[in-house]
Amino acid sequence: MSDQSARPIGLFDSGIGGMTVLREVRRLLPGENLLYLADQARCPYGSRSPDELRAIAAACAAWLIARGAKLVVVACNTASAAALADLRRRFPAIPFVGMVPPVKPAASRTRSGVVGVLATPATLAGDLLHDVISRWAEGVHVIEQACPGLVEQIEEGALDSPETMALLRGYVTPLLDAGADTIVLGCTHYPLLVPQLRAIAGDDTLILDAAPAVAQRVAQIVQERGLMRNVNTLSGAITCATTGDPERFANLIHRLDLPCDRVEQAVITIDA
């Protein structure tokens, strides 16, 4: 154990979505202190340019590191695709873990040979997803489906609304019609819609989320680097901060039954 072990693991996303990753990290590492930043003032990220995303991600990471983060999880597929390499260059002393859409397990587990990927427009425009597809999905038909509007609906907590269901049905039905038996969730917000997705796609469709693998990678790094918090029975604290409205964010966390001890206001400055 090092002196850094009590410092928090930091995570950030444009909003509530990255809390699905925090939930998995908490499950694997219940003794760790967690610090989560929701940049709701700039949500959604999915239509922003790569330059914008790199500047925003750098500011979010700097905020977490200034508050003692010993490791930072980029709990957002869009920001990971645009900014992960840049963050590692900017902050070489801090380990970063990013989101990679689980195309590899999807390609190995599909029975029909058709896989659908649900993601934001910016994630689909980036190189990361295409690199993963070309490397791991040879011989598999991968259909990329942009899902504008879903993040905004989730941020409103409108998971079961007619508008959300209409959007989701419009995005998923073409994948099913094309023969997809496996759906990759390429945005950390989308696991919050798994029950709704299951209602459309049916129980036989495999739905894959990257969060468990990311949590495993976080656990591996803190163990290998001697950063594991030395606790036996005490649970770590979970602090959440938002650049938006803290009261509204706290209510959303509660409605979605996500783990959090307290919610704070955050102010970050984006370098031009």
From Swiss-Prot:
Q: What is the catalytic activity of this protein?
A: L-glutamate = D-glutamate
Is Nucleotide-binding given among the entry's keywords? no
The organism's superkingdom is given as: Bacteria
UniProt keywords (A-Z) are:
Cell shape, Cell wall biogenesis/degradation, Isomerase, Peptidoglycan synthesis
The record's section on InterPro entries has: Asp/Glu/hydantoin_racemase, Asp/Glu_race, Asp/Glu_racemase_AS_1, Asp/Glu_racemase_AS_2, Glu_race
Active site at: 76 (proton donor/acceptor), 187 (proton donor/acceptor)
The entry's protein name is Glutamate racemase
Q: Which organism is it from?
A: Roseiflexus sp. (strain RS-1)
The gene that this protein is the product of is murI
